[in-house]
Each structure stands twice: as structure tokens, then as C-alpha cells.
Amino acid sequence: MRRFLIITLVLFPFFSLAQNLRSGGKLDPEQANMDIRHYTIALTVDPSVQSIDGYLEADLILAKPAARLVFDLTQVLRVKKIWVNGKEHKYEHRDHKIFIPAAASFAAGKQKVKIAYGGIPAIAERAPWIGGFQWEKDSKGNPWIAISCQGEGAKVFFPCKDHPSDEPNEGADMIITVPKGLSVAGPGLLKKLSHKRGWSTFHWKTNYTISNYCLVFNVGKYKLVSRDYITIEGNKVSMQFYVLEENAARAENHLDVLERSCRVLEKYFGEYPWVKEKIGIAETPHLGMEHQTMNAYGNKYQYTKLGGQDFDWLLHHEFGHEWWANKVTNRDWAHMWIQEGICSYGDALIVRDMDGEDAYIKRMQQTARNCQNKLPIVQGEEIDSDQTYHGDIYGKGAFFMHTLRYVLGDEIFFPTLKKLATDPQYTYDNTVITADVEKLFSNAYGKSLQPLFHLFLYTTDKLEINIRQVDADKYSISVVNLEMPIPIDIVTDTGTKRITIGSKPETITSQTMIQVDPKVYYLKKLVYE
């Protein structure tokens, strides 16, 4: 029985692995001392045995001398050798971590670590939500490979510092070798393609900072369909679609759909973030993921109509993450709503642009109805990807932006939202938490928005509005659980009035029963006395 168990674990290491892996959380002090500057990932990918083999090189800076270096790598992959600054080092690989002790001490400053490794990586159980590798085939029987690892972290296939607070500031190189006839779609620019003895090597390079979970590649029998795109700032960038050969006829229309999305996203969030490289999408066997400059797309061209034109919700949402996740990145998974909620708000903004304000309002009303409100959006600090993840970080996060728009007004809200997406202090090498967003919008508003942020992001409470009829035609209205006055639309017999209401009751005159916040700008509870 014991021997059978060992064999089972060796042959099928992926059964429970992905569900047990988490990304982020409390940052290990030894890893906090490491500033990752650059990754080089060189792998041979063999679909016939579902294996990877190669090495990782990490350039890093130590803030102070260290007794050891610590990297993350799943146990199902085997470390073969490790070198630090060209010298072979001893190591220990346990609990999904690699520990590299120094003979005496690693000096502060620059270090180069090379880790040779390989094996059969974890299989994605339910990609992209429970991630890992997918070894699929297209309808013609060709290998079709994808990686998704947002929840688990990139440690599912390469040694890394698995925490959202640190990205390789100087970018990354991916050198991926696959059987000849297949193509590799990766991040950044394709610098070199070479062929040798039945294998093809694709060298992808990005000079931008990039999240670990976006540092992935896709493999398939792809055809590259491309065009030039002129950004809102007048810059030319290549728009590329790595489409399965069997779906190549769909590619041009799909790029039309993508281009419409890009125009709207640039309008609200500023120029496409990666103009020095490309706009990229790759067809994948899973639904999709926001992999930087090579978004994963697997919605099978299931378009709906928006403004009378083809629209793909999945394509638009994942592409919106180029701004919200890839350019503006949460420092701690606890604040994941910044990436998912604001990106989801971008899903509503394209409805506004293509179908009008009324359609946008209806969408946000439906979003309000869909909010579960079982857990706060922000549940604490230094929590991992699994602890923070639930549906409301999307919908309720988006609805909170809708509320902010109403409270601030369009003249303040939209420029401030664009500033969050474009100001260097919030973007690229810099990461953000909720306090940064609150401070930015409060400064723009001229008053503290802390009570509003606290109520809707840190609790599951709804805005409580007290309504009391004090006379035949008079009503007293007050806000019970918010320590700041806010505008509220009130419908009376003479029409709709926008009135600023706080904890002190306001008297409203109306011959008919009043309606409070009829268009639903707040998640609220009305209490009638």
C-alpha cells in the first residue's frame, strides 16, 4: 500500500497540488531583502511527455547581507543545480521553497542566481481559476499548451519570488524551445527565432516590469495575424493575434473587436501602457487571463452586440487588465479589488460609450443586485490570493467606482480615475493599496472620503437611510451609518432633486410619497419609521 502511494504521487503529482498553492500573503523577511531586477527563463517544452527542462536566471539586489537566498518553486519540479555569481551552491528544496545558504554571507548589492531544474509541472485542474499547465490538442490534433497561475503564482513552473509587491523592474527574457511546427506566443517582443534538429526556439523579451503570473507563454499551431494600431497619443504599436490556424478566418474581425475596446479604454484610462512592445492576444484552451502584452483568449468568439457592433466581454475585460493589474498593480493581494473592481468598471464604461448612459445605469443596477455582500472587499492586510478572492471584488468593486462617480461628479471623477492609471507614482514600478486610491480621490474632492471607502470596502454594511413622514406632505431623511454628508437623489411631486444629506435630518416637502436614490447609485438599506 505504501509503495502504491509513492508511485501514485510520482506519476500524478498534480491531483491536489494546485488547490494547495497560494500566492502572496505575509512576505518572508528573507525575501523582502531581495529586490528582483530581471528574470531569464529558458525551457525546452516536450508535449509528448508533458515535461519542461531548463533553467532560471535571476538578477537581484540584496538590501543588506543575507545568510541565505529564498525562492519559490513547487515540489513537483526537481532542482538539479544552483549557481550564485557563477559558483555552484548547495541548496534545500522543501515546502515549495528553495533555500540557498551562503558559506558565510551573501553581500549586499547585486547577485546573479542560476537554477537548473525540470520535470512534469502541475496540471491545471480548472484553468484559469485553479491553474497550472494545460496540455491540450486543437481540433486537428496539434499540441495546444497554456499556463495560468494567478492564484498559485509562477512557482508552478519557474523559481521566483512569489509576491505581488516585487516585479522584475528591468523585465524578463523567455527562451522557449518546442517541437518544430509549433509556435510560442509570449510577452514583449520576439527577438529571435531559430531552428535546430526538429526543434524551434523562440526568444521573447520584455523590458517592462511584469507580474510573475503574467510571465507565461502559450504554445500551439498558431498563425500570426497583425496590424498597426495608432494610440490615443499618436504612437504606432503592433496589434498581434496568435490564432489557431483552424480559426484564422476569424482573426481580422476579432482584431476589429479588440480595437474598439482599446479605443474606449484609452479614452478613460490613458494611452495603451506597452507601446514600445505590442498589443497581443493568444488563443488558449482556457477562458482567458490578463497576461501582459499577450492576453489569453478562450471565449470562442461568442460575440454579443453593443451599439450594433460585435462585442466580446471576455476579450474586453482581460484587455482592460493591461491598465488595471499590469500597469496599476496591487502591492498586496488584500487590495485585489483595485485590479478586478476597476477593470470591471471598465466593462461598464464601454456599455456607456457604445450603448449610452441609460444602458450603463441599467448595467450598474444589475451589478448592485448581483452583489453578495458576504465578505468585505478588503479583509485585512498581507493576505494571500485565496483568502482575498471572491466575486464581490469584481462587482462590488466596480459598483463602488460607480458610487464615487456620483459623489464626486464627472468633472472630478473621470480625470482622477485617469490620473490613477497614468501618474508614475501609481504605475509600472510602483504598486498601490486602497489607502493610495482613497487619498488620491479625497484630494481631488477636497474632503476626506475615508468614511465612504470604509463603509463599502472594509465592511459588508449597506448605506442606511432613515425616512420618517412628519406631516402629510413632509418627510425627514437622514443617513445613519456614514460620518459624512453625501448627495442623494430624491423624487418628489415636483421632480428629482439632488440633496446633500448627512446624519442631521433634512426635511423634504412632497405631495406624493418620495423615492430615494431611484437610479441606484448606492448599495443601501431604506429604513421607514
Predicted features, each with a name:
Residues 78-84, 185, 449-450, 470-521:
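Beta-strand-rich binding/interaction modules
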Residues 18-53, 136-144, 450-451:
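N-terminal, polar/Ser/Thr-rich
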